[in-house]
């Protein structure tokens, strides 16, 4: 979960999402990520054991509003659509907004000491969880989805107004001075948190606009160690996503708030057992730096945080919408009861009532 300057029973999407299309996984089921595993001998408690679900006929676009995406990563080949760099003003070291959605270079300093390289890798990692194409077994939840990458932060941080413009542009709304998005998203993933304790009116207005248009907004709850939701996860109309461990427990780093819509796999410290899920990390497309300083585009089991829980939900929604493209955000509550099961409650939040998503055989296709 990237921290930047920047609902009542908490449905918990245990988006292990073994309910992925069988065609894509037919030859690779022995090395699926543990959170996608359907095999009962390899499925973690936080996994869903269900029959694979073929994607529907509708092509669904997911916007990833993040640090940018590495367009040449082989795990995202054939997945990416044209995106945009929405970073404005002095924070944009390239001089201004453009169609170059790639992240800042790893050695970018922005005039201060950078202690994290997340601005280089974060967006690519998030996008791969949504729609990774199977390269080195980097399977996303819905590989047939298409990703529109939108960069809103880099080495110099993020301006709150850039987030508003990014959300509007992602859904196909007009943003002054920016060409229109030719591929409006049905799902917007925002794996960014740490903003204000109340949703700013301008941001809430933007979210209202895009949800009325039929776009789902999925937001990471934040890694604030069981404190209340911060912006943008505290805005009305978003699907805010907290994190579970492989053992189906709400993690100690996840935000904890009755308004949290869903908890799903976010990973954590390695488990002290020999299970296939003992690593307790999510598989991501990322960058490895060699001894010479050169970057290698790799796949690694290293993802931990609500940042990585959110794209599991975004991937599930895109899979669901591929069968039911007319569904809108207002429809989610009427469907959610068909997708939930309980997970252990924390005494620290007696009003949270967390439940988990169960994808029964063909439920995505058959539920009317």
Question: Where on the chain are the PLM-derived regions?
Answer:
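Bacterial N-terminal signal peptides that target proteins for export
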Residues: 2-11
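C-terminal subdomain of the subtilisin-like protease fold in secreted/lumenal serine endopeptidases
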Residues: 37, 42-46, 172, 178-192, ...
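Active-site core segment of subtilase-fold serine proteases
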Residues: 28-131, 135-146, 162-165, 169, ...
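Boundary at the C-terminal end of the N-terminal hydrophobic targeting segment
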Residues: 24-26
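Substrate-binding/access-modulating region of protease and related hydrolase catalytic domains
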Residues: 121, 133, 152-237, 247-250, ...
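Structural recognition of the beta-strand scaffold that forms the well-ordered cores
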Residues: 61-64, 128, 139-140, 146-151, ...
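Bacterial N-terminal signal peptides
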Residues: 11-20
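Extracellular S/T/G-rich loop segment that most often corresponds to the catalytic His/Ser-adjacent loop
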Residues: 66, 87-89, 233-322, 326
